[in-house]
A protein has these predicted regions:
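Tight coil/turn sites that cap or link beta-strands
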Residues: 59, 147-148
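Extracellular beta-rich ligand/substrate-recognition surface
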Residues: 43-45, 134-136, 144-147
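Short beta-strand and strand-turn-strand segments in soluble, beta-rich domains
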Residues: 128-138
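The feature marks short-to-medium sequence segments in extracytoplasmic or secretory-pathway proteins
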Residues: 112, 119-129
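Short strand-edge motifs at loop-to-beta-strand transitions and within beta-strands
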Residues: 141-143, 149-155
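Beta-strand-rich interaction surfaces with strong enrichment in secreted/lumenal proteins
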Residues: 51-54, 140-144
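Extended terminal and domain-junction accessory segments
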Residues: 1-118, 156-157, 161-163, 167-184
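Short amphipathic alpha-helical segments, especially helix-boundary/capping motifs
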Residues: 38-40, 127-130
Length: 184
């Protein structure tokens, strides 16, 4: 069979920040290593748990801020410098802070739009070498959060109530606890 893509894809409407019930106070989720465990806001996986911060109302739109605050366990730095895995310019390399790793964050049950990607806390050299590969337009269900990066996303919680998971899509991180429930 012959198949051709349409000349123009169907338009989509992004969610407006002004439609969020928490536009001025987004929920904050920090992804980091703490006490040798991959955590979200200091918590690890509990199969039937969702904290107040992880509880949303049906038929609402919210903004969440996802923060990759790096390692925490071994101090500052990063993979590329300041004592990080690759060492600094004058340091000769080393294993420093291997815990500052990218986290591809996947949120089940919803799709979202990316409102803002704050890279001000990232190493500028690293960001400038990778920024062309990021696609922030359209609907997403997973977003890559680099070390030092903050991302604001907006999503609508509709159709279903229940417990749904959100997690880092690095299997080792997910298996070590970087997965949580949110409740609608």
């Amino acid at each position: 069979d012959d198949f051709a893509l349409p000349a123009q894809l169907a338009p989509f409407n992004m969610l407006a920040a002004s439609s969020a019930i928490n536009e001025q106070n987004p929920r904050n989720f920090k992804f980091f290593m703490e006490r040798m465990k991959w955590t979200i806001n200091g918590n690890t996986w509990e199969p039937r748990e969702a904290t107040d911060r992880e509880t949303v109302k049906l038929d609402t739109t919210e903004i969440w801020e996802l923060v990759n605050s790096g390692g925490g366990m071994m101090g500052g730095g990063g993979m590329m410098g300041n004592g990080g895995m690759m060492g600094g310019k004058d340091e000769g390399g080393g294993m420093g802070n291997m815990m500052q790793m990218p986290h591809p964050i996947h949120i089940h049950q919803v799709q979202f739009n990316i409102l803002e990607r704050d890279t001000s806390a990232m190493d500028a050299t690293v960001w400038n070498s990778i920024k062309e590969g990021f696609i922030d337009g359209g609907w997403q269900d997973t977003v890559l959060v680099m070390p030092g990066m903050k991302i604001k996303i907006i999503m609508r919680f509709e159709d279903f109530k229940g417990l749904f998971v959100y997690h880092c899509h690095n299997l080792e991180h997910e298996d070590m606890g970087m997965m949580r429930n949110y409740s609608i």
